Amino acid sequence: MIKDLRARDIMIHDVHVTTPSDLVAAAKLKMMRCNVGGLPVIDKEKLMGIITHRDILLAGGEALGLKVNDLMSKDLMVVNMDTPIKDITKIMVEKGYQRIPVVEDGKLVGLITQSSLIRAVADMDD
């Protein structure tokens, strides 16, 4: 049943990431190549923030020459692997988040996206 699912059951394990010192232009290119709307920002295995395609668009063309650290969101909502899916869904709906990092001991272990959540619900019928 869906109410029994936890973050660990639906999270994306192979997460595309960037670093604070990468250029925004490189992060944008990686998002396009990987077909993702945002990248967690990792420094020495620790989650530092997230940068999204929307962040880059809102900042304008001059943002492409900045470092990811200058543009990333640092105040993140994160969950752990045991967070119930119903809690994650509530957060995503109420806050309008499209992705939520899954962390253990400050380290990124996965990512919950709207797509991964929908896929999990759709798979419940199988």
Which role does the model predict for each range below?
Residues K3-V15, L66-L76:
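Bateman (tandem CBS) regulatory domains
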Residues L5, D22, I51, L66, ...:
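Short beta-to-alpha loop/turn elements within the nucleotide-binding domains of ABC transporters
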Residues I12, K44, H53, G65, ...:
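ATP/adenylate-binding site constellation spanning eukaryotic-like Ser/Thr protein kinases
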Residues D14, N35, D75, G96, ...:
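Conserved functional loop/turn residues at catalytic and ligand-binding sites
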Residues V17-N35, I42, V79-G96, V102-E104, ...:
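The conserved cystathionine-beta-synthase
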Residues L23, K46, P84, K107, ...:
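Residue-level recognition of oxygen-bearing side chains
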Residues G49-R54, Q98, V103, L111-L117:
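Short hydrophobic beta-strand motif reused across regulatory alpha/beta modules
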Residues I56-N69, I118-D126:
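A short, polar/charged loop-to-alpha-helix boundary motif
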